[in-house]
Amino acid sequence: MYEILKVLNHNTILVLKENEEIIVMSKGIGFGKKQGENVDVPRNAKQYKMQKSYQAKQKSNNIFDYIDPMYIEISSEIITLTKERFGKVEHDILLSLADHIYFAVKRIKEKDFPSNPFNMDIQLMFPDEYSVALKAKDIIEKYTHEEINADEIAFITLHIHSAISVNKVGQSMEVMRVIREFFKKLQADLNIRIDANSLSYIRLMNHIKFLLLRLNNNEELQMDITEFTKEKFPFAYEQARVLCEQLSHVLHKDLPDSELGYLALHLERILSCTIIS
């Protein structure tokens, strides 16, 4: 038996079991129920354990004061899509995603449309997560009758990525910022224009995506071409070293030397097919 802490709506309740707070979602589970009552939870009910840290718990409880439970249902459907696409979801994003969608819809109603400067890079680095976010767009529209734009889809992509990796949304945004500012400076210094849709650029973004996975799994590339690229492509090597230092700073991890060599090779390919402005 679970003790009801709060009835959010007919289909969603917050319960306590063995000193653990859990959001339970099942059709009609909250109908006619009151705080303090005990309730049986169906075996097929969706359950989301609340974060245990004090700060996270306080934020979670505050969310219930202002957010329509409908947004928790939206978030739950998106998590289901994520599980279907990627398997197990490593981190619970139920409330953080619901909170983001709530404010996204609020901004739409207020005609406030913040831009996402990392939209294209997010699509290139996380195409699978982005495909789930596109489906999430339809779920949001089904519930709210509001259509989110491409920039918001990219933001939701980062939430989905954080659910299947150890990278939090803020950290992923920092990685995107570092990459964007690095190429902005490189283009200005060399008076060139880099095509973000080129195959070479897409390959670089894909390499960085798997670089992050290798870091998270404490894995290293088997072949080290660092000395080769240092001798063959000294300028690209030096630029790759700068990028590695910047990424290490935001990730709080040192990048192996083997990553430097491959980043240099990708940068050389990009630079070899750039257009002088």
Which ranges hold each PLM region?
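A cross-family "folded-core" feature that marks the main globular domain of proteins
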Residues: M1-S277
